[in-house]
Amino acid sequence: MSQPPKILLLYAHPEPQDSVANRVLLQPAQQLANVTVHDLYAHYPDFFIDIHHEQQLLREHQVIVFQHPFYTYSCPALLKEWLDRVLSRGFANGIGGNALAGKYWRSVITTGEPEDAYHPDGNNRYPMEDLLRPFELTAAMCRMHWMHPMIVYWARRLQPDVLSSQARAYGEWLASPLPEEER
């Protein structure tokens, strides 16, 4: 059996102490040798991103996981800054920008609303699949494989056993993230 691929888990939450769901989700990742958990807010509290360091981390990993809360139909500000600065032309896209080609992108998102809020008749009027399209397009721009996102709806209100079950499933996926035909 081959080694599991190296995973870079980019965690972006500006108030991690307030997010029980994200703390629980991170627990299995922190136990796996093939996963590098990189807390962007802990690493860059001043938002001064070391672009070369971040690009080197990306080069060293095959699967990139973006774990964050869903803020204003997007991601927290530091992750947006990271995406704009690190995934630069000539590195991740454009002429000569092939560093991420063939790697995998998976978004792991927590929301403050239930799943039915992301529906034409719901508060947000659109399904989550549509709202995540900018991330999917960014992955495509970088020539990365878009993996089906993991969405933890209504994260603050989940019963502990449901949250534990989702964290367990997340941990199992992290241990073997690639599609079966590529393992």
From Swiss-Prot:
Cellular component GO terms held in the UniProt record: plasma membrane
Similarity comment: family membership: Belongs to the NAD(P)H dehydrogenase (quinone) family. KefG subfamily.
UniProt key word Cell membrane: yes
Function description: Regulatory subunit of a potassium efflux system that confers protection against electrophiles. Required for full activity of KefB.
Pfam family membership, one: Flavodoxin_2
Keyword Cell membrane (UniProt): yes
Catalysed reaction equations from the record: a quinone + NADH + H(+) = a quinol + NAD(+); a quinone + NADPH + H(+) = a quinol + NADP(+)
Species annotation: Pectobacterium carotovorum subsp. carotovorum (strain PC1)
Main location: membrane
Protein name, as recorded: Glutathione-regulated potassium-efflux system ancillary protein KefG
Subunit description: Interacts with KefB.
Topology relative to the membrane: Peripheral membrane protein
Enzyme Commission designation: 1.6.5.2
An example Gene Ontology molecular-function term: NADH:ubiquinone reductase (non-electrogenic) activity
Residues of the signal peptide: none
Subcellular location: Cell inner membrane
